[in-house]
A protein has these predicted regions:
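N-terminal targeting leaders that route proteins to membranes or the secretory/organellar pathways
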Residues: 20-82, 118, 479-487, 492-498, ...
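N-terminal activation segment of mature serine protease catalytic domains
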Residues: 51-111, 122, 277-339
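Active-site region of chymotrypsin-like
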Residues: 87-103, 167-178, 201-279
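Conserved active-site neighborhood of the chymotrypsin/trypsin-like protease fold
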Residues: 114-195, 200-203, 218-221
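Surface-exposed amphipathic alpha-helical segments
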Residues: 268, 278, 330-331, 444, ...
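Secretory pathway targeting signatures of secreted, lumenal, and periplasmic proteins
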Residues: 331-387
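Signature of long, low-cysteine stretches enriched in small and polar/charged residues
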Residues: 388-449
Length: 518
């Protein structure tokens, strides 16, 4: 599922598959300038050619009479024209600059709320300022070219929203209700309009339609069938009456005109928090935002793990093995195989992963779970060659140890265990988050050791979980792996899940191995 989150435009490339973030780069500017130059050259050369070969007046008159009457281009939507003209004075471009030199690092959009000096945008537009306020500073540019300072007031990482204060006030076009029940209900197919500054080319409006709430996202998002481009992150999406429907946030890279919005109800809730405690908001230091982001991520991981374990893991059969998976609205599973008579070995692979993750920074997305199972067998390879093949695969799937300034060095433990007639090697590694002390990445990898020409490798990855929840899920995953009848395995998994849910108290959790992140 290739998606693009509408990030502030920056000089870095979009992130990996998933909701990727819309950035502008210097190369984009170059391509645009090059295209413009070529168009000018073509126009000039066309004019010169016309001067060299002029059509006689009589011939021109005859040609005009013979030529079919040209049809005018369709007029642009009058609704879009009127909305843009009414809204333009309250649209802003949000720029993130390096403090040292005040050079542009990234660009997004935002909108003034009512007649206040509060502006709504995306968290990912302001993430650099929230995480590294000593390095980055913000400014706004309005549709008339006026500039001013930007002060970050509040963030909602889970829904990708932020509220900032600027040095000017709105005209009152973008009205946000005080309560969520005052928001207009959207109906599928109705026209919506997204506004922002795409590609740093200038302010624009795009027209599309509303097509429901995305069921596979962990938090509600709206599907907008219309174009949204880099730099429109944080811009408003409104209905034909100018009422807020949502905030531009991302688009799908694998489809046409499949874009996503943060629902307006989350805008209302964040503004309520800002307006309810203005003194506390004003007194916040830059360090408070890192702590607040950590608190929200911790809240997400609790919800994520509880959702994962709210019912027993599903069990699927791969040859003689029973393997745990989770299929839900938030997690999808895919399979592939290389079954062909000429292959020296055959594999079947299952991959399950969450459809979304939480954006913290361009380098860090977290709050994510994935499960992989890789079953191989061979008749043509001898046991030695087959064993070597699986050793190489095991090492390749471990991903190696990479240095990462955001995480601590991995602390790993390895054990050989017997579980439900299945002997296996298990390696678990844990890395801590440097900025967020209570969060860890867990990686658990297993390899069966019970057969010479048949092999199962499994992997569980948990990103951004507490140490207690990480060990809790890893223990349950290990207990669910094994052999035996499907009914017996399902019963076993159900009991294991129930026991794990009863052991939510960290003091009751018994770790399968003594692992601490350094």
């Amino acid at each position: 599922m290739l998606m693009m989150r509408m990030m502030p435009m920056t000089t870095t490339t979009p992130q990996r598959a998933g909701r990727s973030y819309l950035f502008e780069s210097e190369s984009m500017k170059f391509c645009f300038n090059l295209t413009t130059t070529l168009c000018m050259l073509l126009a000039l050369s066309g004019g010169a050619f016309a001067q060299q070969k002029q059509t006689p007046p009589a011939a021109a008159s005859a040609a005009a009479n013979a030529a079919p009457e040209s049809k005018p281009l369709p007029a642009p939507s009058s609704a879009a024209q009127k909305l843009y003209e009414a809204a333009r004075n309250d649209l802003l471009q949000i720029r993130v600059l390096l403090r040292n030199g005040l050079t542009q690092s990234s660009v997004g959009s935002g909108f003034l709320v009512g007649e206040s000096d509060l502006v709504v945008t995306n968290y990912h537009v302001m993430s650099q300022i929230a995480l590294e306020p000593d390095v980055y500073v913000g400014e706004f540019v309005d549709t008339n070219g006026a500039r001013g300072s930007v002060e970050l007031l509040a963030v909602d990482v889970l829904h990708d929203l932020a509220v900032v204060r600027v040095s000017r006030k709105g005209t009152g076009f973008f009205q946000v209700p005080k309560q969520t029940n005052e928001l207009k209900t959207l109906t599928q197919g109705q026209y919506l309009y997204s506004l922002g500054n795409p590609l740093d080319l200038g302010f624009a409006i795009s027209e599309g339609s509303y097509n429901g709430i995305i069921g596979r996202a962990f938090y509600d998002q709206l599907m907008f069938t219309g174009p949204i481009n880099s730099g429109m992150s944080g811009g408003p999406n409104i209905n034909a009456d100018g009422q807020i429907a949502g905030v531009n946030v991302s688009k799908h890279l694998g489809g046409e005109l499949v874009s996503f919005l943060v629902p307006a109800k989350f805008v209302v809730e964040l503004l309520q928090k800002v307006q309810a405690a203005p003194a506390q908001i004003a007194a916040k230091s830059s360090k408070d935002f890192v702590a607040e982001i950590g608190r929200q991520l911790n809240e997400h991981q609790r919800l994520m793990v509880d959702k994962l374990l709210e019912k027993p893991l599903s069990l699927k059969t791969l040859g003689p093995y029973a393997v745990p998976v989770r299929e839900s609205d938030q997690m999808r599973c895919w399979g592939r195989s290389n079954i062909k008579p000429e292959n020296s070995y055959i594999f079947d692979q299952l991959n399950c992963q969450m459809e979304s993750s939480i954006y913290v920074s361009h380098q860090l997305q977290t709050g994510h779970i994935s499960i992989q199972h890789y079953y191989t067998r061979s008749k043509d390879l001898g046991s030695v060659r087959f064993s070597h093949l699986n050793s190489v695969n095991f090492k390749g799937r471990s991903g190696g140890v990479t240095k990462d300034a955001r995480l601590t060095a991995p602390s790993c433990t390895e054990e050989f265990i017997d579980n439900q007639q299945l002997s296996m090697r298990a390696v678990m590694c844990v890395r801590g988050y440097r900025k967020f002390a209570q969060l860890y990445d867990f990686s658990l990898q297993t390899a069966s050791t019970d057969q010479s020409l048949m092999h199962l490798q499994s992997r569980l990855d948990l990103k951004g979980v507490s140490f207690e929840n990480g060990t809790r899920v890893a223990k349950l995953f290990l207990e669910a792996l094994g052999k035996g009848g499907q009914e017996a395995k399902a019963s076993k998994a159900s009991k294991a899940t129930k026991a794990a849910n009863q052991a939510k108290d960290p003091k009751e959790v018994k770790n399968t191995s003594e692992v601490k992140a350094q």
